Structure formats: structure tokens, C-alpha cells
A protein has these predicted regions:
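Alpha-helical initiation/capping and key positions within long helical/coiled-coil segments
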Residues: 22, 26-29, 70, 204, ...
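Non-catalytic, usually N-terminal nucleic-acid engagement modules in DNA/RNA processing proteins
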Residues: 1-51, 163-166
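Generic secondary-structure signature for well-ordered alpha-helical cores
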Residues: 35, 39-42, 106-109, 194, ...
Length: 250
């Protein structure tokens, strides 16, 4: 009804430390829902085609928590169905990306896109996901963190509400080309947050979203010219310094 270009089949998410029996039942339910969604999706696309409308893409969602056998089974089950792409759900921590994503991506068809659901709360997630085979991401973190004054810069994350920015008339990030950085200063954004003005959250969100998009653009360029690992090392070393997240190596 809303005309989404991509939508996900229903899936059941389990807690990472749930009992294996619970995880198995949730995975089986996810698979049953996936097949039902695929049938209805094909019916709806036939209607779209008859009306000359754009077709929608449906992704199956791989589950299985932290269990390699279940993850590979789920990826194989869904990979045998004619989905347009695949989502990977239930990855809670960056430290899980290397294992879970690699298990799944080794099993899924190579010619279909892979989407990592709900992970991207920090730049390292993007690099890890791409390194292990992810094509696209979604995450609320850039805007949620922006609403709380946490802003991304290429030299690390800052809290724009801190007193040290009250008289800082530089942009949030001198290298950023977003509307916020081109038109406003750290001092002004600091004032907006201290005054509890909604415009502060809006301008902060614009900046964080642009930072993420620029980072992904740069990752794509590095893949095309064969410099991904060099770019990853230089970017993360500058952003995190000696405080690398768990599971991240340079």
C-alpha cells in the first residue's frame, strides 16, 4: 500500500542468549513466514505488472542467533527461494559481524544483495559489514545519536552540548559538505541544544546522515580502485585513535 521499493519478509528475532530450542523454533517460524510472504509478494507483483506499475523487491531474513549451524541452514533455506535479496537479522554487537556475517554470506547466493539489519551505530560497523560481504545497511543510530547531541566527525564523535563548544565558531567538521556545516557553527548548534530547540536535533541529524553517506561513498570508491583496506586503516585510526571497538582490527 505504501509502495516501498524493498521490503522484508516477516521474521522472528530471538535474544542472543536464548535457549537453542527457542532459536530453532523462531528460525522455523521465520522460514514459514518467508514462504508465505513470497507467495503473496508474487501475487502483488503480478497485479503491479498488469497495471504498469513498478515492481517491489522482497528480501528473506536470515536468523539463527550466534549458532553457525543454524545460520548456515537458514541462509541455505532462504537462498534456495527466489527472493530479490536477503537480510541478516539478529546481529547485536560489532564483535559478532565477522563470524555471523561471514557464515551467512558464504552460504547465500553471490548474485543477490545482502542487507545487514539494524547495525551501523558507528563507522566501524560499515567497514566490517562491507569487508565480510554486506551491500546495504539500515540503522536508526545516526539520527538517534544526533538528537542527543552526539555528532560524527572524521576525528571522532563529539558531544555538541559540552560547554567547550559554547564559543567554538568552527563548523561541526571542516571537511563536511552538509547543509549544517556549510551554514552553522558548533557554537550555534550548542546553543540550540542548550535551549532545547528542535532545530538543533534537525541540523544535527542532517550532519550525521551526510557523514554516513559520505563514508559509504568513500568505501565504494576504495573498493573500485582496490584501496579498501588502506582506506579502512586510515579512516578508523583517525576516527578512533587507540580506542578501537571490540572486534575491529586495522
Amino acid at each position: 500500500a505504501i509502495g516501498a521499493d524493498i521490503h522484508m519478509a516477516f521474521d522472528e528475532l530471538t535474544a542472543p542468549l536464548a535457549a537453542r530450542g527457542t532459536i530453532v523454533k523462531a528460525m522455523q517460524r521465520t522460514h514459514a513466514w518467508a514462504e508465505r510472504c513470497l507467495v503473496r509478494h508474487d501475487e502483488l507483483n503480478a497485479e503491479h505488472l498488469a497495471r504498469g506499475e513498478n515492481l517491489q523487491a522482497l528480501y528473506g531474513v536470515v536468523q539463527g542467533a550466534r549458532d553457525e549451524t543454524l545460520r548456515r541452514h537458514s541462509a541455505n533455506f532462504l537462498g534456495e527461494r527466489n527472493f530479490d535479496g536477503y537480510g541478516i537479522g539478529g546481529v547485536f554487537q560489532p564483535g559478532e559481524i565477522a563470524d555471523v556475517v561471514s557464515w551467512v554470506c558464504e552460504t547465500l547466493p553471490e548474485d543477490k544483495p545482502r542487507h545487514l539489519l539494524g547495525l551501523g551505530s558507528q563507522p566501524a560497523d560499515l567497514f566490517l559489514g562491507v569487508e565480510y560481504g554486506i551491500d546495504t545497511f539500515d540503522c536508526v543510530a545516526p539520527t538517534r545519536q544526533a538528537r542527543n547531541g552526539a555528532l560524527y566527525t572524521f576525528d571522532g564523535r563529539i558531544n555538541i552540548s559540552n560547554a567547550r563548544f559554547c564559543e567554538d565558531f568552527a563548523p561541526i567538521d571542516a571537511e563536511c559538505d552538509c547543509y549544517t556545516c556549510q551554514h552553522h557553527t558548533r557554537a550555534y548548534i550548542n546553543h540550540l541544544f542548550r535551549a532545547d530547540e528542535i532545530l538543533g536535533a534537525t541540523l544535527a541529524s542532517i550532519h550525521n546522515e551526510r557523514f554516513v553517506v559520505r563514508t559509504v561513498d568513500q568505501i565504494r570508491a576504495s573498493l573500485l580502485d582496490g584501496t579498501f583496506f588502506d582506506f579502512k586503516q586510515s579512516f578508523l585510526a583517525r576516527y578512533y585513535g587507540d580506542d578501537l571497538p571490540i572486534g575491529v582490527t586495522l
